[in-house]
Amino acid sequence: MTWTAKDSGGGLWGPGPNVWRSDNVAVQGDTVTLSVRQVDGVWTSGEAILDRSLGYGRYEFTLLQSPYLDANAVLGLFLWDDDPASPNNREIDIEFARWGNPWNEAVGHFTLQPWDQPGRQISYRPADGPQTCRMTWSPGYIRWSCAGISWSYYGADVPTPGTERVHMNLWTIGPVEGAVSAQVQFRYRGQALGRP
């Protein structure tokens, strides 16, 4: 599998919006390191994008450090389809974010977009330390799990495969204390054809 890095060329792109730099993404073996840092007085973010679509299956993201990041940092591990005709961009998310509140302990989020419709997101307090999170995507069914927390969504509105790809990003909703980084390992475990 090959990762490419998002680069906005100094412009502001979503999410955020943020300035995205390719040098805020480093790949070594099966580990992707994402960074948020200040460059010439501007906060910049990093996003890695897998080179191909994988479709139904089990997506595993191993976070090599605590998910409790700076209050203004957001770590996203998700599927996204750039096709504007795709339903809600086929976005299926695992996120770690305090959303600006340093006292927020429910920093883990499992989401099937759009998040603001009832029953499409849960927030939880994750374990503090390295952990493996999974999204199992099957026809009409998605199951998320992370360090003993699990949640499932069933329905005809679960997206079918298209041209979605795995994205991993680290971005900011405001200034952070120094540079912030996250190390993630990704594995794909094969096609899932039914409900477990």
Language model segments and positions:
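Ligand-recognition surfaces built from glycine- and aromatic
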Residues: 56-58, 84, 157-196
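Short, aromatic/His-centered strand-loop micro-motif at the edge of beta-sheets
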Residues: 109-132
